[in-house]
Each structure stands twice: as C-alpha cells, then as structure tokens.
C-alpha cells in the first residue's frame, strides 16, 4: 500500500496568468491537499472516495478525475506494452472543489504519482507532467500547468514550455508568509475563464509583460520589495473580482494591515495576502476570518511555499 499527498497550489500570483504557480503548505503542519492511496488487488480495478469534501465529487465514477487519470495512465502503459496491475485507488478529497487552490490538480497529481510509483516508475517527470496537464485541460477547457506543475514538483514554477521543459523553478523569498483565505463558496475554473474578454488593449498587454519580466528578474536578483510591487494583474483580476465577495474592500484592508501584495489565487474565490513576517500574517489571518469567510466551510491558513511537492506519506 502506498499513500501519496499532493499539496495545494496558488496559480497566477497576480502577475503571471497561466504562467506562474506555487505550491503551499500551512505552517502548523496540517495537510492542505489531497491524498491518493493505492493498493494491489487480486484482479480488476476499484475506485473509492473519502474525505471532508467527498460529497462534492461526481456520483458517476467515470466523471471522477482520478478515474480518468487511471484510464489515461493505462492507455499510456499499453503504448509501451506494459500491463496495468490490478489495483484499488482511494481518493481522500480534502480540498474544496472550485476553490482556486488547485483542487483538481491535487487529485490528478496524487493519482498519477501513485500509479507511476506502483508500476516502478515507467514514465519520467516530464512525461507524467504532460499527462497531468492534459487531464487538467479536460476540467478547465484548456491545457495549462500552473497548478499541476508546482503541486507535483514543489516551489514556485514558471511555465516555459520550450527546449523539452514544461516549467522551471524560480528562486523565491523564504521569509514571506502566504495567508490564504477560502470563503466557502465555489467558482468553477471554466466560469472564471469565460468571464475574461476576448482581447486586451495594447497598454494592458505591455503592462502585464513589464510586470512579469520585472517580477522574474526580482526573484533571481533577490529584490523582495520589487517582486511584491510587480504582483499586479490587469489581465484577469479586474473581471474576476465580480465573482468574489467584497474583494476590492478586502484587498485594500489587507494592504492597510501590512500585506506586501494581495490577489486572487488561481481563478478564485480563494485570495492570497503576502506578509513580510509572522506577526503581520496573524493580523491578516484574523481579519480575513472575520471579513472574507462566508460560511462554515471557509478557512484561512498561514502558509509557506512548499518546496517538496507531491510525496509519499508514512
């Protein structure tokens, strides 16, 4: 039996729409992500589901992304004349669906890593990552790696998709705290993409390119202040903020409390606020608990960048 944990991720980081993402883990040691357990069977295949958010999963097994991961993995194995082993997969669904924290990526990554390890790792990291992106595209409507890449590999990942590399890890700022607030409501990735305009002004494109280039430069040259200042979004946030509860006021309040940057995590509704120290992070956490959460399913976590990515649990 093998248990694989895949951590939550925050995509875009405001400045890198579909090109940046980071894996995150709560500083209290709790697991913010999904777990997939795999075990051998005498014959056949079984899929089971458990976890706090299991009730949000599709009733039909064929619509479960873990089942689809199994089918895709099996198809790729057959192309190499390798038989899939009889097995049972159990998804522990601990991530809310449509949260902006890479919920589908967690399930996809945990499932494919478990399947690959169970079969003595026939696929390389890049081959596995390509499969992860394909599965993510089935849910969101387009292939993108800004959740699956950091969830799988850890760290802050920049999507390059050239010279045989899907992504490359950026050096980042270990001193930063990420305060992530999920309000308890759902925003589908497809809906959040549909709300975006079909075209942008030249000035918006230039601004976003300048911000992203400056952000990447700041990461490599260890300029934390510049990196934080460049975490701006003119591509998605102006349109997606309508899907989030009182976002503009909450964003301003977090900045007043000392946040270095505040933005939408992925397609929302989770938001992130970056704090320079633990004291500021705790103030932000308290504020967001009181002013952004909408129901009992909402939560706030103080996190750091997770540099491990998907991993086996003892």
Curated annotation (Swiss-Prot):
A GO molecular-function annotation: homoserine kinase activity
Pathway(s) annotated for this protein in UniProt: Amino-acid biosynthesis; L-threonine biosynthesis; L-threonine from L-aspartate: step 4/5
Domain of life assignment: Bacteria
GO biological process entries: threonine biosynthetic process
Main location: cytoplasm
Cystine crosslinks: none
Catalytic activity field: L-homoserine + ATP = O-phospho-L-homoserine + ADP + H(+)
Localization per Swiss-Prot or TrEMBL: Cytoplasm
GO cellular component, one term: cytoplasm
Keywords, comma-separated and alphabetical: Amino-acid biosynthesis, ATP-binding, Cytoplasm, Kinase, Nucleotide-binding, Threonine biosynthesis, Transferase
Pfam families: GHMP_kinases_C (PF08544), GHMP_kinases_N (PF00288)
InterPro entries cross-referenced by the UniProt entry: GHMP_kinase_C_dom (IPR013750), GHMP_kinase_C_sf (IPR036554), GHMP_kinase_N_dom (IPR006204), GHMP_knse_ATP-bd_CS (IPR006203), Homoserine_kinase (IPR000870), Ribosomal_Su5_D2-typ_SF (IPR020568), Ribsml_uS5_D2-typ_fold_subgr (IPR014721)
Sequence positions that bind ATP: 96-106
EC number(s) reported in the record: 2.7.1.39
NCBIfam families: PRK01212.1-4 (NF002288), thrB (TIGR00191)
Protein family membership: Belongs to the GHMP kinase family. Homoserine kinase subfamily.
Function recorded in the entry: Catalyzes the ATP-dependent phosphorylation of L-homoserine to L-homoserine phosphate.
Name recorded for this polypeptide: Homoserine kinase
Organism: Pasteurella multocida (strain Pm70)
Lineage: Bacteria, Pseudomonadati, Pseudomonadota, Gammaproteobacteria, Pasteurellales
Gene, per the UniProt record: thrB
């Amino acid at each position: 039996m093998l248990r694989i944990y895949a951590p939550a991720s925050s995509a875009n980081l405001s400045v890198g729409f579909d090109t940046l993402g980071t894996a995150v883990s709560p500083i209290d040691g709790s697991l913010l992500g999904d777990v997939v357990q795999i075990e051998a069977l005498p014959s056949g295949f079984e899929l089971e589901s458990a976890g706090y958010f299991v009730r949000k999963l599709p009733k039909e097994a064929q619509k479960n992304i873990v089942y689809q991961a199994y089918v895709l993995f099996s198809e790729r194995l057959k192309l190499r004349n390798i038989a899939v082993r009889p097995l049972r997969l159990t998804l522990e669904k601990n991530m809310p669906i449509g949260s902006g924290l890479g919920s589908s990526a967690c399930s996809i990554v945990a499932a494919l890593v478990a399947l690959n390890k169970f079969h003595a790792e026939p696929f390389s990291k890049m081959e596995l990552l390509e499969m992860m992106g394909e599965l993510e595209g089935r849910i969101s409507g387009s292939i993108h790696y800004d959740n699956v890449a950091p969830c799988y590999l850890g760290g802050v990942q920049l999507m390059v998709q050239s010279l045989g590399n899907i992504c490359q890890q950026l050096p980042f700022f270990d001193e930063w705290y990420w305060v992530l607030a999920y309000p308890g409501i759902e925003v589908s990735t497809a809906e959040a993409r549909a709300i975006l305009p079909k075209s942008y002004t030249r000035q918006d494109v230039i601004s976003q390119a300048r911000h992203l280039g400056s952000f990447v430069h700041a990461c490599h040259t260890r300029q934390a202040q510049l990196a934080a200042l460049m975490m701006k979004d003119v591509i998605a946030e102006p349109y997606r903020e309508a899907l989030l509860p009182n976002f503009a006021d909450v964003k301003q309040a977090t900045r007043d409390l000392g946040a270095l940057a505040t933005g939408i995590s992925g397609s929302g509704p989770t938001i992130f606020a970056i704090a320079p120290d633990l004291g500021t992070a705790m103030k932000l956490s308290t504020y967001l608990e009181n002013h952004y959460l909408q129901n009992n399913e909402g939560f706030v976590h103080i996190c750091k960048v997770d540099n491990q990515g998907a991993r086996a649990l003892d």
